[in-house]
């Protein structure tokens, strides 16, 4: 069987018709191939930094003062000055005081006089409001703290969300009790949301370059999610048949070769025990961004996204909804932005 082919990547980025051909070609790829592609890339990313991930676990325990030294009694192991913890807390406090507690921790400027005025009276206040509503200041400090512990602060994930909120429509007087009874109606409200993602849950192309968060050919964000979220995402355009087939399983097969013990490890970092009641089932979802490759490894569709779980393609391949383009790589930006206070030069 001949491999699925499409116009060249650069041609697809320049010509909408060529991109449509590439998107159509990606739809002809089997779900088994797409799931295998995501799994292979995740496994590649995980194995490439396996030793670093082991160091993360050690450094986390070192910061939490959970280190035991062989050849010493328990009381001797615990009788030490927690210098890593103190250093991290002091650095975090300095970051918060110098960057976050300041009312002018960032600014927006323009190139000419009209744009400067527009930036001052519109864009800067609007951006500050959006960042304040999504908790950017607090999550920035959390990321800096993780960065001082691990050397990698993790990832900030910006997304646009919409929810239904109650809005006061009026009030009436209760003739029996004399109380004022308000009336509400559900109205849609959209807002900027920000998730802070720990580095354990992100699998990035090992060929990515430092200080260039959109380099590399793929990035995967993996999270365990409950059944309720998957059922709700059917109305958001996910594949109903694929979601229902996934929900018919117990969720254990969705982990495949990666993150098989991630829930237990996350609970251990929180100093918790991992136990779930029999009515709660969770499934490992992989949100993938990158270039879709065919059976021979040739790019079929650039700047794509899809969501898979185990052997089920729940959404996509679809066009990356972010229209911002990274000038260094020429690709669409993905919503995950990495940051590190301790940058490795290579």
For the regions a language model picked out, list residue spans one by one.
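Extended, helix-rich architectural segments
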Residues: 1-345
């Amino acid at each position: 069987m001949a491999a699925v082919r499409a116009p060249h990547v650069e041609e697809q980025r320049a010509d909408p018709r060529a991109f449509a051909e590439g998107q159509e070609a990606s739809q002809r790829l089997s779900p088994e191939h797409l799931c295998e592609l995501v799994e292979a890339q995740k496994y590649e990313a995980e194995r490439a930094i396996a030793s670093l991930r082991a160091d993360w676990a050690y450094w986390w325990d070192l910061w939490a003062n959970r280190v035991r030294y062989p050849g010493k009694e328990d009381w001797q192991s615990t009788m030490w000055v927690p210098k890593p913890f103190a250093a991290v807390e002091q650095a975090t406090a300095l970051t918060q005081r110098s960057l976050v507690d300041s009312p002018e921790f960032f600014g927006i400027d323009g190139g000419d006089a009209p744009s400067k005025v527009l930036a001052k009276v519109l864009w800067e206040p609007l951006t500050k409001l959006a960042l304040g509503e999504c908790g950017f200041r607090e999550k920035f400090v959390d990321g800096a703290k993780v960065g001082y512990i691990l050397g990698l602060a993790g990832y900030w994930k910006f997304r646009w969300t919409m929810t239904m909120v109650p809005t006061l429509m009026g009030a009436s007087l209760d003739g029996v009790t004399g109380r004022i009874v308000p009336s509400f109606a559900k109205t849609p409200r959209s807002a900027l949301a920000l998730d802070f993602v720990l580095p354990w849950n992100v699998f990035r192309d090992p060929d990515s370059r430092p200080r260039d968060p959109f380099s590399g050919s793929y990035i995967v964000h993996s999270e365990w999610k409950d059944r309720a979220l998957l059922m709700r995402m059917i109305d958001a355009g996910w594949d109903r048949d694929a979601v229902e087939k996934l929900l018919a399983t117990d969720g254990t097969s969705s982990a495949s070769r990666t993150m098989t013990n991630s829930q237990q490890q996350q609970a251990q970092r929180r100093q918790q025990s991992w136990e779930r009641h029999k009515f709660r089932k969770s499934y490992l979802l992989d949100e993938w961004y990158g270039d879709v490759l065919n059976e021979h490894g040739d790019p079929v569709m650039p700047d794509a996204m899809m969501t898979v779980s185990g052997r089920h393609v729940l959404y996509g391949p679809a066009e990356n909804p972010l229209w911002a383009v990274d000038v260094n790589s020429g690709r669409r930006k993905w919503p995950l932005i990495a940051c590190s206070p301790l940058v490795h030069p290579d």
